[in-house]
Amino acid sequence: MAEIKAFRGLRFTDKAGSTGEVCCPPYDIISPEQKKQYLAENPHNIIRLELPKTAEDTDEAYGKARAYLNEWLDEEILKCDEKPSIYIYEMVFDALGSSYSVKGYVSLVKLEEFSKGIILPHEETLSKAKEDRFNLMCATGCNFSQIYSLYMDDDNKVFTLIDNASKGVPDKQFTDPDGVTHKLWCVSDEAFIADLASKMADKKLYIADGHHRYETALRYKKFVAENKQDVGTSEYVTMMLVNMENSGLVVFPTHRIVRDLENFDVNAVIEKSKDYFDIETNLSRTDSTAKLDKAYKDGKKAFVLYCDGKYTLMTLKDTSLMEKLMPTASKALRELDVSVLHTLVLERIFGIDKENMANQKNLTYTRVLDEAIEAVDNGSADCSFILNPTRVSEIRDVALAGEKMPQKSTYFYPKLTTGLVMNKIFD
């Protein structure tokens, strides 16, 4: 099963500046303007290496990232730890009116093809994003950020082990602009590392966030094997590993925004939907949110259509309909809210096919409810769909069935910060 390994983490030294100034959110949620802001605050921010190329840059940006990396290594702005270590990582945050803590650990994980069933994906990926990550790995030979993965540990033995090893003052700690406190402990004790590896040896891993980076790491592993004598740690990738039963795991919904449809008629859409859904129209925002939440708690498949200032709750009448529409899919996949929306509404009623969805021609995504509403109100979108979050158990069940959810089915919050610890693949 999963093989984990300690590594000599590449970390910023005090020469770089404060920890909070050199870390940033994941590259794929940072705009060119935000990148400039991070670098204005501190020119050593990890975004200079992790996101060298934006829409404004050419492919030469990857080479520049390598040059900066070498410069920072020479100046000891970045430095590898002396001993192979496991890095215990905790995020403390507020969400949905409550306080949470999620604690896991960062290690190397041996790369495995998905077909082996050891490391399991749950979402589809886009080729453009993978090409960018591959070019960056080839240029720098580093994992700058971690793949976020989950494992099952019903008796909590792994968590107890890492929790006991992180009782002292963290090696690094900062609070980001969103109010999330990030803590990191470096543990090099060989007995601890061996015990952790043993406890993980029977476990499957479920990728929560970072599918593009994992598939890129698989490709890079093959590239190195074919082109280099020294493979370094290219047969591994860095992951943040968290118990699937951790009470701090928070998944936000990702809402759908539909735009640029020809002859869009919301009344016709609602009329067609009545064959498949129980419809409640003319709801207020407050009522629609409350009813959507109740549907979630009751295990019903539902979402809210927003158009012309009106909220319409759509609740699937009969889940057996999805079996007819997705006959080869598992029960876990076809009964997801996003599967019902994509297959029954977007494809069947709206006529938006899978390729269109992948290219985001008529469909875009946001986790911010106000953005989904504002896009309709300002006329840039025809309508939007407000969804409930996907359950962690649903992610597990789809992955175990060997299937993948539609893109943007999950949004784990908070996102892992980038810059606390990295992996330099070659010494």
Name each region found by the language model.
Residues 1-427:
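Surface-exposed, charge/polar-rich loops and edge strands
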